[in-house]
């Protein structure tokens, strides 16, 4: 027998028991006549004592070094009161070793568990990095999350159904990973960016509650929180309204937080996309931050200051204010830094007003724009923003999107810098009623979610006539400023689906080529259906308290989409390429 108990599971209830432990030497201390080691496995660490009473084990222990893989047979005893370690889960007990076996020795590690290693080192020697207790804990939490999700979905009548990994390329906003076919030379499969169409087809097949914990692939430029392969908790339902879908998924996430970290998230408020953008400058607002954005275009539209009056009088402009309570001590240097910061988002500047005395009107403020304002105007701004003495007001004025993005980013930065964001709180919400379409960089209409999202209360004819005023029957779940899941009611009318394709510039020939199977399926009594998908990696990040998505994936890629451990991607051998009828052009 190699193991009777896990190291990290031992406690006072095991005192007097004989145990067999298998794991690694975490630390070793030689005190002359006694040797102590901290022994580690996936459940934690326990102190093992080698005593002269068991001389053979003590002699063998003198050769132990960090990360040797060993087996201990011994007895659990209570630690003396003055040696209890309250920082360890097993700190009230230790194991007296009666026998020691070494499964395997270890070279000196290229990582140091007691100090910060570079990201490159950690990813190159990932199998060693995962031995660190905090990393093991992340993956155990991830396993706990998926176990809870499977249990919840099963209890609520959802069927776990797999969908294909080798599929057809579809335009979903990012580039596909392509897989060449050896049998069909010159043709390619695509790895799925999501199981979207297959789960809709499952609804058409009569499986009215589907879920899957599934790998998805996107060949996009990576950011810190993106990976080329990621995992979704994918869900689809038939005969359920959007509020019903949100309710059953909210209950799942509520239970997940309670089960994993013992936190009651309470009832999730619902907010429209328009309100989220206007008040918080983001479609994924972090409600732990009390700062809000307030519109003042109507107040400043006729002042003699073009920076404000031009956007205030434009249908596509915005003049907005953030009030920072007690922000009067923000220095000019800090204001200059914030001005530079909003420039990243396209803002041309950042006006400000410091309020020394709210009752003194213009005499009571300090501001480079005071000369353009009247007493009536400044009072109206004070009233609109609920300003007080000792506050500072920051103004953004530009095109609506630029001003909204810049002020939204500034709001988050101010919340962090000034300690206003309540980092110990959980603030979930649903964001609903997104625009159906948005303009891409070329000015063409693109689906804000995806082309299979249904509009709210629009006929195909109304949508064709006025696509930019359509609201999507879509919803995102947001927790602490992170979008953890998103979904929508799907189009189940073939005419509506063709109308959306047409608005997106997909002509009938392209529709048949890319989505013929879907358009055909929609003709055969398709039920109303809706669903959503959660990012498992993002959920795990939140529940483990890490801000690095790579910490919650066992073997992640770098931001350059490479695996430093296996050296993937790599060159293919010529014979394999020949069989695939592929010729690679090498860059010079």
From Swiss-Prot:
Keywords: Aminoacyl-tRNA synthetase, ATP-binding, Cytoplasm, Ligase, Nucleotide-binding, Protein biosynthesis. SUPFAM superfamilies: Class II aaRS and biotin synthetases, GAD domain-like, Nucleic acid-binding proteins. GO terms for biological process: aspartyl-tRNA aminoacylation. Its EC number is 6.1.1.12. It holds the Pfam family tRNA_anti-codon. It comes from the Bacteria. It catalyses: tRNA(Asp) + L-aspartate + ATP = L-aspartyl-tRNA(Asp) + AMP + diphosphate. Residues 196-199 are annotated as: Aspartate. It is found in: Cytoplasm. Homodimer. Catalyzes the attachment of L-aspartate to tRNA(Asp) in a two-step reaction: L-aspartate is first activated by ATP to form Asp-AMP and then transferred to the acceptor end of tRNA(Asp). Belongs to the class-II aminoacyl-tRNA synthetase family. Type 1 subfamily. NCBIfam families: aspS_bact (TIGR00459), PRK00476.1 (NF001750). This is Aspartate--tRNA ligase. It comes from Histophilus somni (strain 2336) (Haemophilus somnus).
């Amino acid at each position: 027998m190699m193991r009777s108990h896990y190291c990290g599971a031992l406690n006072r209830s095991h005192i007097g028991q004989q145990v067999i432990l298998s794991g690694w030497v975490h630390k070793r201390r030689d005190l002359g006549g006694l040797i102590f080691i901290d022994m580690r496995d996936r459940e934690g660490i326990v102190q093992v004592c080698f005593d002269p009473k068991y001389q053979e084990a003590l002699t063998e222990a003198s050769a132990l070094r960090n990360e040797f893989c060993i087996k201990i047979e011994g007895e659990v005893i209570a630690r003396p009161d003055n040696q209890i370690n309250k920082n360890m889960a097993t700190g009230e007990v230790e194991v007296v070793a009666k026998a020691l076996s070494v499964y395997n020795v270890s070279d000196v590690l290229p990582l140091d568990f007691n100090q910060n290693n570079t990201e490159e080192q950690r990813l190159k020697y990932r199998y060693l990095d995962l031995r660190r207790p905090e990393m093991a804990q992340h993956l155990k939490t991830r396993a706990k999350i998926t176990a809870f999700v499977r249990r919840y979905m099963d209890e609520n009548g959802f069927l776990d159904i797999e969908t294909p990994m080798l599929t057809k390329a579809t335009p979903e906003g990012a580039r596909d990973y392509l897989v060449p076919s050896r049998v069909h030379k010159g043709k390619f499969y695509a790895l799925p960016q999501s199981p979207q169409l297959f789960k809709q087809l499952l609804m058409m097949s009569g499986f009215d509650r589907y879920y899957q914990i599934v790998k998805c692939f996107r060949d996009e430029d990576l950011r810190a929180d993106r990976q080329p392969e990621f995992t979704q908790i994918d869900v689809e339902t038939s005969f359920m309204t959007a509020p019903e879908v949100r309710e059953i998924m909210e209950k799942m996430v509520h239970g997940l937080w309670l089960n994993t970290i013992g936190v009651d998230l309470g009832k999730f408020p619902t907010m429209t996309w328009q309100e989220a953008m206007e008040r918080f400058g983001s479609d994924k607002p972090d409600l732990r931050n009390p700062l809000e954005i307030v519109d003042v275009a109507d107040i400043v539209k006729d002042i003699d200051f073009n920076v404000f009056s031009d956007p205030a009088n434009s249908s596509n402009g915005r003049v907005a204010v953030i009030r920072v309570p007690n922000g009067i001590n923000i220095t000019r240097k800090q204001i200059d830094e914030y001005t530079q910061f909003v420039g990243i988002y396209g803002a041309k500047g950042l006006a400000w007003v410091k309020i020394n005395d709210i009752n003194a009107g213009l005499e009571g403020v300090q501001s480079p724009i005071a000369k353009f304002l009247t007493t009536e105007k400044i009072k109206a701004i004070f009233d609109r923003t609920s300003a007080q003495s000792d506050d500072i007001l920051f103004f953004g004025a530009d095109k609506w999107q630029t001003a909204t993005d810049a002020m939204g980013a500034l709001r988050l930065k101010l919340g962090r810098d000034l300690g206003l964001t309540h980092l110990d709180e959980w603030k979930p919400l649903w964001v609903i009623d997104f625009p159906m379409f948005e303009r891409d960089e070329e000015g063409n209409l693109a689906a804000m979610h995806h082309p299979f999202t249904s509009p709210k209360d629009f006929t195909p004819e109304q949508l064709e006539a006025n696509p930019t005023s359509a609201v999507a029957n879509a919803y995102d779940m947001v927790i602490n400023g992170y979008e953890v899941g998103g979904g929508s009611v799907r189009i189940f009318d073939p005419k509506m689906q063709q109308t959306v394709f047409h608005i997106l510039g997909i002509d009938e020939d392209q529709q048949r080529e890319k989505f013929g199977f879907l358009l055909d399926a929609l003709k055969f009594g398709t039920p109303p259906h809706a669903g959503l998908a959660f990012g498992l990696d993002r959920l795990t990040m939140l529940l483990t308290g890490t801000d690095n998505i790579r910490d919650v994936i066992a073997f992640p890629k770098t931001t350059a989409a490479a695996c430093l451990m296996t050296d993937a991607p790599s060159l293919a051998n010529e014979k394999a390429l020949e069989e695939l009828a592929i010729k690679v052009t090498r860059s010079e």
